[in-house]
Amino acid sequence: MSKVYVFDHPLIQHKLTYIRDKHTGTKEFRELVEEVATLMAFEITRDLPLQEVDIETPVSKAKAKVIAGKKLGIIPILRAGIGMVDGILKLIPAAKVGHIGLYRDPETLKPVEYYVKLPTDVEERDFIVVDPMLATGGSAVEAIHALKKRGAKNIKFMCLIAAPEGVEAVQQAHPDVDIYIAALDEKLNDHGYIVPGLGDAGDRLFGTK
């Protein structure tokens, strides 16, 4: 079974409070989401492998460490996931960015791919799938499936707020994918919104309704 990591860092929790607040405007909301994504990226990359290299400082030769292993790819789930990408790229500027778009089938109510654009070297990368919300888990499950069937092996899922139902859905469908969240909320309401949540992340990011 995959692991669930809840980041309780004071800066993350402080900024998340204002992200939740319904009085926070679009500009500030967008900036806060980006900032929290940066802080979460710092934590999620804590286990990246290192290798020793030889360098020369202005004073002497030295042994130093650089990141080793596979390169990273960031995959936002459209459209709200886009709001987290720049924050991650501030720490990992060389990461490649793909996109996965999903729509809900009106009859089955299940997510269906409508757009998938990934780096050409999928099998050579480790991926972080990002979406501000993990509600029912349907979109996350399908996005991860889309990556796997195209050759991705090592995938992590990162979101700001999750409901227990969404976490369970991802764990059952993808027990090899660890989940990283800023807050685990109480439940989903009858309309599928996370409670207390933050509302519709996409609308709040882009100023739409």
UniProtKB/Swiss-Prot annotation:
This protein's UniProt keywords: Allosteric enzyme, Glycosyltransferase, GTP-binding, Magnesium, Nucleotide-binding, Transferase
Binding site for uracil: 194, 199-201
The keyword Acyltransferase is annotated on this UniProt entry: no
Role of this protein: Catalyzes the conversion of uracil and 5-phospho-alpha-D-ribose 1-diphosphate (PRPP) to UMP and diphosphate.
Name used for this protein in its record: Uracil phosphoribosyltransferase
Molecular-function GO terms, alphabetical: GTP binding; magnesium ion binding; uracil phosphoribosyltransferase activity
Source organism (scientific name): Anoxybacillus flavithermus (strain DSM 21510 / WK1)
Catalytic activity: UMP + diphosphate = 5-phospho-alpha-D-ribose 1-diphosphate + uracil
Source species, domain of life: Bacteria
Pathway: Pyrimidine metabolism; UMP biosynthesis via salvage pathway; UMP from uracil: step 1/1
GO biological process, one term: uracil salvage
HAMAP family: Upp_B
